[in-house]
Every structure is written in C-alpha cells, then in structure tokens.
C-alpha cells in the first residue's frame, strides 16, 4: 500500500480565517454550556450557591489544612439570607432558643438539617420559643404549588433531614460507604410551616463547591451548600413559582 504524502502549502490568510472560525465555534460552545446555578433561577425563589459550611473541620486525621473535630453548626434565616455560626456556649445561648433562625445545618459536613422546633429534644432549638414543622414531598421543586394542610403539618414526624438510609427515609441525600460521597436525591422538596404561619418550600441541592452534577473525587471541596427556597409572604398556601 502506497503512502501518499500531500504537499503542505501554508496560506496565512487561510490560517487566520480558520483561527477566527475556531474562536467563534469555541465561544458558541461555551455559551451553550448550561450554568448549573443559572438554571435554578425562576424569578421568585431565593437561590443560595456555594454557602460555605465548616470547611476547616475533618472527619479523620491527616487532612491538610483541617482540624479533627466536630463540625460547627450554622443557622440560616430565610428572610435576609443571614448565616449565623454556633462555635461556643455564648453563641448557643444567644441564638439557639430564639425565633431568629429558620434552619440549622449540623453534624458531619453540616449535612443534617433541622427546622427550628422547640419541642424535639435533639433539635438545636429545643426548649426555645419557635415551633416549625416540615413535611417531605416526593416531587420536584417546580411542581410543588401548594403547601400541605395544617393537619398534615401537625401530624408530621419528620425531625431531621439528612442521610437517607433508604428510599423510604426523609433524608435529602444518599451516602456511599464505599466512595464516601454524598449525592442529593432528585424529586425531594420540603414544605415548611414557620412559627409565624408562613409556608415555605425548600430544595437541598448540593454540598459540593460549584454545584457539580456528580462527584467522583473524594477531595472535592465541601461543604459548600447550594439550595433554593420560596417563602409565601401573604400567609397563603400558594407555593407556585413557575
């Protein structure tokens, strides 16, 4: 079989035109790539991206730049997106038993979420003044248009939103004991009744920086929380956002 060698004729105008086309094509591809956070916007909901949790704590020893200790809890307030850290007894005394927060991110990698509830003994707000309730709705965030009945909230047994040990669990993520990686469960939305009677829908989306669709690297930066929520300000049960 003959090897055919084609003569090379370099034309600077042709090369320049080709480079321009390549640049335009590359730019078009970049524009076509969906920003995982931009697609979360619906014009009504509040979208929180890469909210840093306790990134200095570690579950095991020998992690560069991190300390082997429990993760500090942080609180979050819906009305003004305020993050409140609980690092010591003084912080606990100032905040935990008040109505000045709505959800608490606790436990390993701040992955265990509680609503502010004075009646549940393991809740950060136990013994305080706030009485919230939460219900898991197994449907996509955009399809949740109505809050459940008050009877359903009163009867709810959902206390902690964390690791889902099974599909029947109320948790928001699966956790692999082999890879030690968290993966948010699709079509899980949490309806919340706040102490002032307002209703909220909440979707916990990701615990990894940049909101990647999937993670295979155990060392991917975490916890950096992405979540979205909508508070119905008029007190009705209307939670439609699309």
Predicted regions span which residues?
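Surface-exposed, beta-sheet-biased, low-hydrophobicity segments with strongly acidic/polar composition
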Residues: 30-242
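Sec-dependent N-terminal signal peptides
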Residues: 16-23
């Amino acid at each position: 079989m003959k090897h055919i060698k084609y003569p090379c004729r370099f034309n600077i105008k042709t090369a320049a035109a080709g480079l321009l086309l390549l640049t335009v094509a590359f730019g078009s591809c970049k524009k076509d790539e969906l920003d995982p956070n931009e697609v979360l916007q619906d014009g009504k909901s509040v979208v929180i991206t890469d909210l840093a949790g306790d990134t200095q704590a570690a579950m095991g020893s020998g992690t560069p730049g991190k300390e082997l200790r429990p993760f500090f809890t942080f609180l979050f307030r819906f009305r003004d997106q305020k993050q409140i850290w609980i690092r010591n007894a003084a912080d606990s005394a100032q905040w935990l038993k008040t109505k000045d927060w709505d959800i608490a991110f606790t436990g390993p990698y701040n992955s265990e979420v509680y609503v502010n509830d004075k009646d549940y003994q393991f809740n950060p707000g136990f013994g305080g003044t706030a009485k919230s309730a939460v219900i898991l709705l197994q449907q996509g965030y955009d399809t949740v248009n109505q809050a459940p009945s008050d009877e359903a909230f009163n009867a709810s047994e959902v206390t902690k939103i964390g690791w889902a040990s099974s599909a029947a669990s109320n948790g928001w993520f699966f956790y692999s004991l082999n890879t030690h990686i968290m993966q948010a469960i699709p079509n899980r939305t949490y309806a919340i009744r706040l102490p002032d009677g307002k209703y909220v829908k909440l979707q916990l989306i990701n615990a990894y920086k940049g909101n990647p669709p999937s993670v295979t690297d155990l060392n991917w930066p975490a916890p950096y929380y992405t979540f979205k929520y909508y508070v119905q300000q008029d007190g009705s049960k209307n939670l439609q956002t699309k």
